[in-house]
Amino acid sequence: MENWPTPSELVNTGFQSVLSQGNKKPQNRKEKEEKVEKRSNSDSKENRETKLNGPGENVSEDEAQSSNQRKRANKHKWVPLHLDVVRSESQERPGSRNSSRCQPEANKPTHNNRRNDTRSWKRDREKRDDQDDVSSVRSEGGNIRGSFRGRGRGRGRGRGRGRGNPRLNFDYSYGYQEHGERTDQPFQTELNTSMMYYYDDGTGVQVYPVEEALLKEYIKRQIEYYFSVENLERDFFLRGKMDEQGFLPISLIAGFQRVQALTTNLNLILEALKDSTEVEIVDEKMRKKIEPEKWPIPGPPPRSVPPTDFSQLIDCPEFVPGQAFCSHTESAPNSPRIGSPLSPKKNSETSILQAMSRGLSTSLPDLDSEPWIEVKKRHQPAPVKLRESVSVPEGSLNQLCSSEEPEQEELDFLFDEEIEQIGRKNTFTDWSDNDSDYEIDDQDLNKILIVTQTPPYVKKHPGGDRTGTHMSRAKITSELAKVINDGLYYYEQDLWMEEDENKHTAIKQEVENFKKLNLISKEQFENLTPELPFEPNQEVPVAPSQSRQGGVQGVLHIPKKDLTDELAQKLFDVSEITSAAMVHSLPTAVPESPRIHPTRTPKTPRTPRLQDPNKTPRFYPVVKEPKAIDVKSPRKRKTRHSTNPPLECHVGWVMDSRDRGPGTSSVSTSNASPSEGAPLAGSYGCTPHSFPKFQHPSHELLKENGFTQQVYHKYRRRCLSERKRLGIGQSQEMNTLFRFWSFFLRDHFNKKMYEEFRQLAWEDAKENYRYGLECLFRFYSYGLEKKFRREIFQDFQEETKKDYESGQLYGLEKFWAYLKYSQSKTQSIDPKLQEYLCSFKRLEDFRVDPPISDEFGRKRHSSTSGEESNRHRLPPNSSTKPPNAAKPTSTSELQVPINSPRRNISPESSDNSH
């Protein structure tokens, strides 16, 4: 048996075969095994054989070969298959054994095989160390043998050597070259126009050499596709960029990604389109040759913004000046859009394009890549009070409203008590202060309940106390007045909630009844639910039997839970059944049904707290104390400064939830305590009734001070009857009604009530009783300052002229004060009134000092009024009192602090200050 050839002989034989045939593939199995053996940690072939045979053994080379022969006797010999190589030398894989060793070892001698093997192994190892990243990517096995096979592990069991998609070749993707073939010159994409570049494949830039003629053909076909009928019918982006003649700038087309993948040279694009039959080029612009003017989409016309007078908008925090529209054309569609805001039409167009599929428009840039711009809306400021707002001319106001876009309301953070109050506001569906706009309907007048103080002398002197030596009936401080005002708010809310709670209580009772077993007749059942389709399993018929009570045949009906809810909603027209809201008036023994719907906001015990200042007051206290009149001191010519001043009373009001007109007089007593239920069991007739018990400290306060409530139309009828019975100027209740009108109409104007107020005031004035007329002038002065009405202002001027021409100064004083303190400065004043006002430059000019016997020159009367204090008429920059100002005179001790140095129009002070 002859000896096997040595590995060096096999290597030299393989090299000769490869060089002769031009093949660089591996030749035999021995060379492969040698490559595996060289990856060991030994430095030479002797060390490897020493480790295989064991340490300390000294064997010959022939024995080692015979040992290897015995081990490999059963293995088949590899037969090399020579294939022609089609790719160039520069594209050979550097990790391949043949490519790295064939050329350097071809000219070396065949002797000294071990030294050659060692040098070759070291060179391969150095290359692998320098190319760690390449080796790590090539194969899972970590060896170079199976780097690009389907399976790279095992000894020679790979399936192919470097076959497959060339894009998967790591060296090829990165343009890897041998050490001797590397160049230091970087690759310039812009200068090489005969290359096509493909991006974003996960490994880097792919470069494919293409002939210039073929590249021009690609460019021509791509751009002709953009201008084809098929693409233009759906490419609205491209058509929107066209001008009226259908031209597009070449820079726009060259900026598309598919064109950039072919070339970035504009000259090459122009050369490629010279012979085009679809596209023509004129002055670095291109368009479709056939019917080019058919495709452009006209853009929106430029928006013209009228000039804005910014001097009128200094105090308007919400005004944001607009910007004129200017068209913006981008040279690169992929760049972020930075410029003027788009028009509404372009915004809608952009949203449509974003919703389109990317396949519909090949020239459409990536709209999703644009950065989002967050626009934060400014918080809307709180509404400013009318007396503190600066008047703006109507023209500027209209211009301001037209220039601003409507803004949606934002949800702000709320505290628990604010959430509670919002829940209460939801119950006021028929009437609200904020929705009234200082107006009230005639129908709502029937819902007003007047709150007055029952005079103690009525029982002893039904005709009234005309002596003028009465004592103060109610000593109320300013804090208690606020508590009463808050209590009337809460009482009004109870009235509105009472109806809802009663309705829910009735519904719950009916629902509980339906959950019980009730014996009813068939006719009654059909009348109750004529439209509900009942299934057989929802009824349990029983045998006909005679009822003990009426002898009527009955049907025992057991409805289900969901049917009960549906039946309750159908019978009582209720969309929500809330058990927690109905439990307030149910006995404690009645079990509460399972909760079906979410409960409403539970009502908490009400405590005195500051109300919203924008709400109109409900209580008008008297703020003057009686004072002896000094007949020698200068004083105004008014009824309060007479020898027998009037007796003024506190008055308030609440808005009931039900219409209590002349035809409806029944009163619910569900909230009244047992001791107070008797007075309320009847009707709100001419006799006042005490308040029902409600959860607020002011309840006891109202009860202790003798406050009662009465329907407005009945209280008015009682006052008119007393005025007719006692005579003009002799009715104390009529004076209280005058005072109520003066306050109430300022916040809730009603034409019918105002005309009656004006008529009765002048009827009393003709009889030399001027209290009603003075209340009317106070309404004019303070009411117009709060809410200006042109027709009321004209009446104010007429009444003032009439009053001044009759020898009185009170009307002219109120008109002078209105002109001084009102924010409206544009109204036209009657020339006669201007002439009358020339003699009065300050408030002290209205003080006269006539003899007390000749002060009025007419019959004394006791119906006088409390007036507004001089301190409320001072300008904002004044802090001094007019000299010898009269102190307040009334029947109550109620001192209300001044909120601001400006003229105060609060009800606690305005009616009783001058």
Curated annotation (Swiss-Prot):
Bias-annotated ranges (Polar residues): 1-25, 876-914
Gene Ontology MF terms: RNA binding; RNA cap binding
Feature: compositional bias, Basic residues: 69-79, 148-164
Keywords: Phosphoprotein, RNA-binding
KW Phosphoprotein (keyword) present: yes
Biased composition (Low complexity): 134-147, 599-608, 665-675
PROSITE patterns registered for this protein in UniProt: HTH_LA
Organism per entry: Homo sapiens
Residues with PTM Phosphoserine: S60, S327, S335, S340, S343, S432, S436
Phosphothreonine modification, residue list: T329, T427, T454
InterPro entries (UniProt xref): DM15, La_dom_prot, La_HTH, WH-like_DNA-bd_sf, WH_DNA-bd_sf
GO BP term, pick one: positive regulation of translation
Name of encoding gene: LARP1B
Organism placement in taxonomy: Eukaryota, Metazoa, Chordata, Craniata, Vertebrata
Pfam families named among the record's database cross-references: La (PF05383), LARP1_HEAT (PF21071)
Domain HTH La-type RNA-binding: 209-299
Protein name in UniProt: La-related protein 1B
Region annotation (Disordered) ranges: 1-169, 327-348, 590-681, 852-914
Biased composition (Basic and acidic residues): 28-51, 84-95, 114-130, 624-633
Gene Ontology CC annotations of this record: cytoplasmic stress granule; cytosol; nucleus
Gene3D superfamilies: Winged helix-like DNA-binding domain superfamily/Winged helix DNA-binding domain (1.10.10.10)
